[in-house]
């Protein structure tokens, strides 16, 4: 049962919301969110796995957050955000509940590393984005130390991994940039837990 999985439960949601409201965490998170906001296109954005809504709350008007935890969805809706309960597996990652032609960008932050079948998931989501008319996709994954810090992580995504899995070009999108943040050097992630890899894809005609 989904309700028995911690990530779907009320305790997990409460902890995510508590952490998102901590003053120091908010200050640090703003630094990271500012960087993401500079990577997306102006206009409505789809935030896949929106969690506690830190990014969703700063996205352009008309943006939508998709989240598997119903308690987080309820909390975000109470804050006036367009958060929607979404079971990606039952929908085969097709984003079928979203209307084509409304969204410019798609973000997926600290989600891809949780899948065993990440290449297949990316191809399905990127294909869905193409159907919706999305022009920019930003995928964010942890560096080495961040990846190792969570036992639920299944796939370690690096620049080399993207290349080796044939994902430099994916479902009509070309990888424009693959940069590490806050320092663009992969080895920083060996000791700094908050190091990230940002993959920026653009739609090609």
Regions found by a protein language model. Give the residues of each.
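Short, histidine-centered active-site or binding-site loop motifs used for metal coordination
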Residues: 16, 141-145
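Short catalytic micro-motifs in class I SAM-dependent methyltransferases
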Residues: 110-114
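Conserved N-terminal segment of class I S-adenosyl-L-methionine
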Residues: 1-101, 105, 109, 122, ...
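Acceptor-substrate binding/catalytic loop of class I
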Residues: 146-165
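A structural helix-start
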Residues: 115-119
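Short catalytic/ligand-binding loop motif for oxyanion handling, primarily in non-cytosolic enzymes
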Residues: 54-57, 145-149
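A short glycine-rich, Lys/Arg-flanked "PGG" loop and its adjoining helix->strand segment in the class I
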Residues: 120-134
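Conserved beta-strand signature within the Rossmann-like core of class I S-adenosyl-L-methionine
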Residues: 132-142
């Amino acid at each position: 049962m989904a309700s028995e999985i911690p990530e779907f439960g009320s305790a997990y949601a409460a902890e995510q919301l508590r952490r998102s409201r901590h003053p120091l965490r908010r200050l640090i998170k703003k630094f990271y969110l500012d960087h993401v906001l500079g990577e997306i296109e102006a206009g409505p954005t789809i935030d896949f796995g929106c969690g506690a809504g830190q990014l969703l709350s700063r996205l352009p008007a008309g943006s939508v957050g998709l989240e598997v935890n119903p308690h987080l969805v309820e909390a975000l809706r109470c804050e006036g955000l367009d958060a929607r309960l979404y079971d990606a597996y039952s929908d085969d990652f097709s984003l079928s509940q979203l209307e084509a032609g409304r969204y410019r960008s798609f973000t997926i932050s600290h989600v891809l590393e949780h899948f065993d079948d990440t290449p297949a998931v990316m191809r399905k989501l990127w294909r869905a984005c193409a159907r919706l008319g999305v022009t920019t996709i930003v995928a964010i994954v942890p560096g080495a130390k961040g990846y190792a810090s969570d036992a639920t992580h299944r796939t370690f995504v690096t620049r080399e991994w993207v290349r080796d899995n044939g994902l430099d070009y994916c479902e009509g999108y070309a990888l424009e940039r693959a940069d590490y943040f806050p320092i663009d050097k992969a080895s920083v992630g060996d000791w700094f837990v908050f190091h990230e890899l940002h993959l920026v894809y653009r739609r090609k005609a």
